[in-house]
């Protein structure tokens, strides 16, 4: 018999193709439904048009499909409710920080440029390497649509920040 905890453990082992954490810790999993030998996984993409969606779907189908008693796996992407950085688990935030990626704390004043999704707050962003607030935005565009590039003037290291969504 298939149980939800087994599926969640598998989802926690699947890395996001663009971020150094699991799809579960990134908060992409909205719901897991089990009916007999079929599993339905509902996923919230970080952005509409995310190019990693086919890879995520294939990995979920492959890994969950390897469970004993699972005969069918369906993956559905939904956009309502929208994904936000508030869905990232504390473990996910810690894992991202070890890779030099910071996450908005959810206390933003709401001052964002909706055209590019960049936080325009005046307050400094702490460096994930040395925790200094002496940081600057280098580019609102990072390696993926959901990240921006920053620089720490104290330790002289670049770092990325997830955009508040």
Regions found by a protein language model. Give the residues of each.
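Domain-level signature for proteins that mediate thiol-based redox and metal-cofactor handling
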Residues: 1-165
């Amino acid at each position: 018999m298939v149980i939800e905890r087994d599926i969640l453990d598998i989802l926690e082992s699947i890395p996001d193709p663009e971020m150094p954490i699991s799809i579960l810790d990134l908060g992409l999993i909205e719901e897991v439904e089990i009916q007999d030998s079929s599993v339905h996984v509902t996923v919230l993409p970080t952005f509409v048009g995310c190019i990693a969606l086919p890879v995520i779907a294939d990995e979920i189908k492959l890994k969950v499909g390897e469970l004993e008693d699972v005969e069918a796996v369906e993956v559905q992407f939904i956009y309502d409710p929208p994904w936000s950085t508030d869905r990232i688990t504390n473990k996910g935030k810690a894992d991202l920080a070890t890779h030099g990626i910071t996450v908005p704390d959810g206390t933003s004043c709401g001052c964002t440029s909706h055209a590019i999704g960049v936080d325009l707050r005046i307050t400094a962003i702490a460096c994930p390497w040395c925790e200094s607030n002496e940081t600057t935005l280098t580019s609102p565009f990072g390696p993926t649509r959901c990240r921006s590039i920053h620089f720490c003037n104290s330790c002289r290291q670049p770092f990325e920040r997830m955009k508040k969504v």
